[in-house]
């Protein structure tokens, strides 16, 4: 396990990937320090900041000022907020703006925003000039603990599903400023918390038990919040280092995502109905229930997972999604397009208990369809 180091209120998680190793800094005040941190690590002195119309009024000026003070000249691109921004149209816009800004390989693209902005910006950084440097400044809990770490980037296919078009492009630095989480809505913070809980459910049962006892302190802020984010980043870093390209165990990070992504596709990525973390929450409960159905785990584990997620205010049932859902057969079509499908065989992340997740190959489609029909509202 890679050690978490701490300087004052800031914790550092190091991701040792050889020449592509990088640090994740977690703590307050990091946007104000961004220029100094970037200048000390990267040679280039130009940057293209990619952000959205929700985040820009809150943090763009502070980031630009920090870069300017460090001698880094920046150009800014402000995009619409929301999952639908992860499209070819906006990817082309970002690539054009990065090229217009004369960003070269030693310069950087900076993603200032949540998972959508990070995924889109990272994809652009990975393909412009065949790869420029990339810095993540995640502004949501979900992006701080998940999408900003590990190098997965991409956009959605409007016809086939979520995150199906993209590249692996590791960041050079992640600055997780915990102060920005104070401006999130309760719904956004809860959605991000689903990914925090996921790490305990994958292979850290003690962390899940700690969350059951301390989740209120994580929501309130302070040291418990920083500790939870650092532990989550460390958990993801460990998996990424062991399996960077998702050839095996990295797929564990998709616990709850096979069902969750299908539900997101079924709602046409309409955030008024369902956001990613809510889909993951429902998906994790479904994964534990399906595991129990397949006699792999105790039904008590599924009930425990649902109890905790419901306690923090997350949805745990498909019936809680606003509006009508398509029939189970349509959900199965989305599942069949999942990135983990190999040679046409369904692959799920299932569990033998809390913190005992595993990659299950060749899951019978008939069993999944029957299960979805049973759970469909």
Swiss-Prot record:
Q: State the free-text cofactor note.
A: Binds 1 divalent metal cation per subunit. Can use either Co(2+) or Zn(2+).
Q: Protein name, please?
A: 3-dehydroquinate synthase
Function field: Catalyzes the conversion of 3-deoxy-D-arabino-heptulosonate 7-phosphate (DAHP) to dehydroquinate (DHQ).
Q: Which gene encodes it?
A: aroB
Q: Name one Pfam family in it.
A: DHQS_C
What EC numbers are recorded for this enzyme? 4.2.3.4
Q: Which residues bind NAD(+)?
A: 115-119, 139-140, 152, 162
Q: Which family does it belong to?
A: Belongs to the sugar phosphate cyclases superfamily. Dehydroquinate synthase family.
């Amino acid at each position: 396990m890679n050690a978490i180091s701490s300087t004052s209120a800031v914790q550092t998680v190091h991701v040792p990937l050889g020449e592509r190793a990088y640090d994740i800094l977690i703590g307050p005040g990091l946007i104000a320090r961004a220029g100094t941190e970037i200048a000390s690590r990267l040679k280039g002195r130009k940057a293209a900041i990619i952000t959205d119309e929700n985040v820009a009024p809150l943090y763009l000026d502070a980031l630009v000022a920090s870069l300017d003070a460090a001698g880094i000249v920046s150009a800014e691109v402000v995009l619409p907020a929301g999952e639908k921004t992860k499209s070819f149209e906006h990817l082309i816009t970002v690539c054009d703006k990065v090229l217009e800004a004369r960003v070269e390989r030693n310069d950087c693209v900076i993603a200032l925003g949540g998972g959508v902005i990070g995924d889109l910006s990272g994809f652009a950084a990975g393909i412009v000039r065949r790869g420029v440097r990339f810095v993540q400044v995640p502004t949501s809990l979900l992006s701080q603990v998940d999408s900003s770490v590990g190098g997965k980037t991409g956009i959605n296919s409007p016809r086939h599903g979520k995150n199906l078009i993209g590249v692996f492009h590791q960041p050079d630095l992640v600055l997780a400023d915990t102060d920005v989480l104070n401006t999130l809505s309760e719904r956004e913070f809860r959605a991000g918390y689903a990914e925090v809980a996921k790490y305990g459910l994958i292979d850290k049962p003690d962390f899940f038990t700690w969350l059951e006892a301390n989740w209120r302190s994580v929501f309130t802020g302070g040291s418990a919040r920083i500790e939870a984010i650092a532990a989550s980043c460390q958990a993801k870093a460990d998996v990424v280092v062991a399996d960077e390209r998702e050839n095996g165990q990295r797929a564990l990070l998709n616990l709850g995502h096979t069902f969750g992504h299908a539900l997101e596709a079924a709602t046409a990525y309409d955030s008024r109905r369902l956001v990613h973390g809510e889909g993951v929450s429902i998906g994790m409960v479904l994964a534990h229930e399906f595991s129990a159905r397949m006699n792999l785990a105790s039904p008590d584990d599924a009930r425990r997972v649902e109890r905790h997620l419901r306690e923090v205010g997350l949805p745990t049932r498909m019936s809680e999604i606003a509006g009508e859902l398509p029939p189970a057969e349509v959900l199965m079509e989305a599942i069949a397009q999942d990135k983990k499908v190999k040679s046409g065989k369904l692959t799920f992340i299932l569990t033998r208990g809390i913190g005992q997740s595993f990659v299950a190959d060749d899951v019978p489609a008939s069993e999944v369809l029957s299960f979805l029909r049973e759970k469909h509202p």
